[in-house]
Amino acid sequence: MAEKEEGKVAAEGGAEAEADEEVEVKFRLFDGSDIGPLRCNAVATTVAALKDRVVADWPKDKTIVPKTANDVKLISGGKILENDKNIAQCRAPFGDLPSTAITMHVVVQPSSAKSKPDKKTNKLPKTTRCSCTIL
């Protein structure tokens, strides 16, 4: 019975430790350079907050520069991260080593590029084309 109690206390302590867990996150840019690492709380920090931080810390000498956080997509573990999730929810199921920083890949897609380009209208009249092949 005492073993069950100890296991329960250890599980509760693990949940508290996870709530206060500080993680290091670094961001890999398109050219292979990095932003960070920065320390943040895994439960309290959302993906949207990370995107804001990436835009604020973006190097000025890059050819591609995001204007807003909506222009940035973060990828971790092969998945595009959703803005409303926190870091703890986005971790890979196998987990990261505690002593290493979590690397997130940054993709910049300007919002103007997301809109579909208008179809170019061809001013030539449409003609019906037929062909016959005799074998």
Swiss-Prot record:
Lipid-bearing positions (S-geranylgeranyl cysteine): 132
Locations listed in the record: Cell membrane
Tree of life domain: Eukaryota
Region (Disordered): 1-20
Keywords: Cell membrane, Lipoprotein, Membrane, Methylation, Prenylation
Residue span, Ubiquitin-like domain: 23-92
Modified residues (Cysteine methyl ester): 132
Stretch forming the signal peptide: none
InterPro entries from the UniProt entry: MUB (IPR017000), Ubiquitin-like_domsf (IPR029071), UBL3-like (IPR040015), UBL3-like_ubiquitin_dom (IPR039540)
Propeptide residues per the UniProt entry: 133-135
This protein's record includes keyword Cell membrane: yes
Pfam family, one: Rad60-SLD_2
Gene Ontology cellular component terms for the protein in this record: plasma membrane
Topological type in the membrane: Lipid-anchor
Function in brief: May serve as docking site to facilitate the association of other proteins to the plasma membrane.
The protein, known as: Membrane-anchored ubiquitin-fold protein 4
Annotated organism of origin: Oryza sativa subsp. japonica
Gene, per the UniProt record: MUB4
